[in-house]
Design a protein with these regions (language model features):
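Metzincin-family zinc-dependent endopeptidase catalytic domain
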Residues: 113-251
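Disordered inhibitory propeptide/activation segment of secreted metzincin zinc metalloprotease zymogens
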Residues: 24-108, 183-212
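Post-HExxH zinc-binding segment in Zn-dependent metallohydrolases
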Residues: 274-300
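Catalytic Zn2+-binding segment of zinc metalloproteases
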Residues: 256-270
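Bacterial N-terminal signal peptides that target proteins for export
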Residues: 1-11
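Second-shell loop/turn segments in exported
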Residues: 98-113, 234-243, 247, 275-282
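Stable alpha-helical elements in mature extracytoplasmic
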Residues: 37, 41, 108, 112-119, ...
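Bacterial N-terminal signal peptides
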Residues: 10-18
């Protein structure tokens, strides 16, 4: 039995307490309500043997009344050869959860997976990532994510099947729960990053680079868009189609930029990592590349 499975029953009981604490409010950097809720989740995680904590959640939005900021508590980075994340040497691994890959707008799991693969391939091919090998791990059918379980939208899975997990398309209510009122209408997707903690629950920096150690990352996509029963029916998830459609690869490129360590920046709409969706963008711009270079330049060859 995996260490995640071994503690899942006790976590289910504890999660019920966490769910009684609403997110609410504007989830901007340092927002008291958002940070307090993250602390509630982290209290549950602290009672487990995983030695991880939620550190930041970063939204990609359509720019209509929703915060385009991150829930953010500190700088984090991946650590090469970190045995705690079952690291594949100096590689970064990712997994696409096929079970939630189809969309209400009619895309199949195979279509969305191919778009996500293309997005990760774009980052891999960018010059700043030349020292890094991004490896895809096969979906073996196990539940590979945990963040959704804190809101009642899935079981507590095994979070160490890959460094980055593409958790799939979830319903509007999940994004309302995470992003507060209006989140289900305005948030296209978000990336949630976990860090490692020591036996006392304190963040770790095992390589002394003055950044907290990234443990894992999960990406969630909003299935409201293109759902005929919602007010976002006219903004369907599509493959390589312009607005008002939402291009899967563009959103995946942005969110996996977060997964690899980038924050929101760049003059809108001229950067992949701008926080508001502005149509198809499949190639990083100089601001994106500069940020990625700063993150990965010290990665061992």
């Amino acid at each position: 039995m995996s260490r995640a499975r071994a503690i899942s029953l006790s976590l289910v009981i504890a999660v019920a307490v966490v769910l009684a604490v609403p997110v609410g409010g504007q989830n901007a950097a340092g927002d008291p309500a958002a940070v307090a809720f993250m602390r509630q989740i982290n209290q549950v995680l602290r009672g487990s043997s995983l030695h991880i904590a939620v550190e930041q959640v970063e939204f990609f939005t359509v720019g209509q009344g929703r915060p385009a900021n991150r829930i953010h508590q500190g700088g984090i980075r991946w650590v090469a050869n970190d045995p705690r994340r079952f690291a594949d040497g100096e590689k970064i691994t990712y997994l696409v959860d096929k079970s939630d890959g189809a969309t209400a707008s009619g895309l199949t799991s195979a279509q969305t997976e191919a778009a996500i693969d293309s997005a990760l391939g774009t980052w891999q091919a960018s010059p700043p990532m030349k020292k890094v090998t991004i490896v895809k791990r096969a979906d073996g059918g196990d539940d590979p994510d945990i963040f959704d379980s804190f809101f009642g939208f899935g079981g507590f899975g095994n979070p160490f099947l890959a460094d980055i997990v593409e958790a799939g398309w979830l319903p509007r209510a999940f994004f309302e729960a995470v992003g507060g009122p209006g989140g289900g209408r305005g948030i296209l997707a978000f990336s949630v990053s976990f860090i490692f903690t020591d036996d006392d629950g304190n963040p770790t920096d095992i390589n002394g680079d003055n950044y907290l150690d990234t443990a894992l990352n999960e990406v969630y996509y909003n299935d409201t868009f293109g759902n005929a029963a919602t007010d976002r029916a006219n903004n369907p998830w599509r493959i390589n189609l312009p607005l008002p459609a939402i291009d899967v690869e563009t959103v995946a490129l942005h969110e996996n930029g977060h997964s690899l360590g980038l924050g929101h920046f760049g003059p809108p709409p001229a950067a992949v990592m701008n926080p508001v969706y502005a149509g198809i963008r499949h190639a990083p711009l100089p601001t994106d590349a500069a940020g990625m270079s700063a993150l990965w330049s010290s990665w061992p060859k």
